[in-house]
Amino acid sequence: MSGPPSHEIGMLYSLAPSVDMKSENIEDLPSESIPTTNHCASNYFYAPECPDIGHLRALSIMNRWTETEFVISDDLRDVSMLTEEERYFYRFLFTFLSAADDLVNLNIDNLLGLFSQKDIHHYYFEQECIEAVHSRAYSIIQLMLFDNDSLARAEYVKTSLNSPAIQSKLDWLNKRVIECSSIAEKYILMILIEGIFFSASFAAIAYLRINNLFVVTCQINNLISRDEAIHVEASCCIFKNYLMGPKPSIGRVQELFKEAVQIECAFLRTAAPRNSQLLDVEAICSYVRYSADRLLKELDMPPIYNEPKPTADFPLALMTASNNTNFFERRNTAYSGSVSNDL
């Protein structure tokens, strides 16, 4: 598959600058980015330091899954049931999610240099592992939507990554990364990528399940969205409790959230099929605003929109962490534990 343009990879890498520990001018590095290197005995064995992050790592481990557990060919019959516009829309969503997920995974290595705590390192190792599963799952789903024509998929990806809807997200991130005054502000941008810029896509895919379409794809979407809920909760926890140095003001964080929500809703409205009965665009935009308020509360900041919780018939409400299984699902994808910020 043709990869995203190199400037996009550079943009996401710049979200968490790596630290060159070989630098002779260590005093020139920002103090907030210099990890602790004390040569004490605890450097050479594991000792719990971050119980909250340790809990999220353990939750992620309990709920490991792989793409090989699912038979995506069961969904092939449903491809022909989509209109041409609907098929284009879902191809577009999975192209975006696949590219963004891969780039987030590339960026995790750079995050490790910001922290000395082994609990945080171990958590990020676990996140890298499951993000790789997401990447492989997205690739399988993409091929299904292109009738297993890998050349057609590659050509489409090459073109769609330059679409205005995706470029608006990348351009905004580029601009904001350049303007960032601290690593903490860049960390907020990472929270927005996984917490806001994925949310409309997850919801739009979930609408397929209430129409008994793409059952296996929806099961995978279920698991990926729950994994990302853990990742975002961990990012909020690390930002609040373990990221040293100056942090952006509440006003600045709210400004970034407002802009991200506007871009995500515009992304959906631009790409969504106009005459489809499958999804409710305005309900999804309401969910995006609700997600923003929820994340701000997770960061101990006041909400912006005071958006109500989605109603019970909103499809992502089926993706709770409790042991519930949709009537149409043939494999139970209930999580072993609970995610505190889930619906």
Curated annotation (Swiss-Prot):
Necessary cofactors: Fe cation
Keyword Phosphoprotein included in the entry's annotation: no
GO terms under biological process: deoxyribonucleotide biosynthetic process; DNA replication
GO cellular component, one term: host cell membrane
Binding site for Fe cation 1: D101, E131, H134
Keyword set, alphabetical order: DNA replication, Host membrane, Iron, Membrane, Metal-binding, Oxidoreductase, Transmembrane, Transmembrane helix
Family: Belongs to the ribonucleoside diphosphate reductase small chain family.
Protein role: Ribonucleoside-diphosphate reductase holoenzyme provides the precursors necessary for viral DNA synthesis. Allows virus growth in non-dividing cells, as well as reactivation from latency in infected hosts. Catalyzes the biosynthesis of deoxyribonucleotides from the corresponding ribonucleotides.
PANTHER family: RIBONUCLEOSIDE-DIPHOSPHATE REDUCTASE SMALL CHAIN, RIBONUCLEOSIDE-DIPHOSPHATE REDUCTASE SUBUNIT M2
This protein's name: Ribonucleoside-diphosphate reductase small subunit
Localisation per UniProt entry: Host membrane
UniProt-listed InterPro entries: Ferritin-like_SF, HSV_RIR2, RNR-like, RNR_small, RNR_small_AS, RNR_small_fam
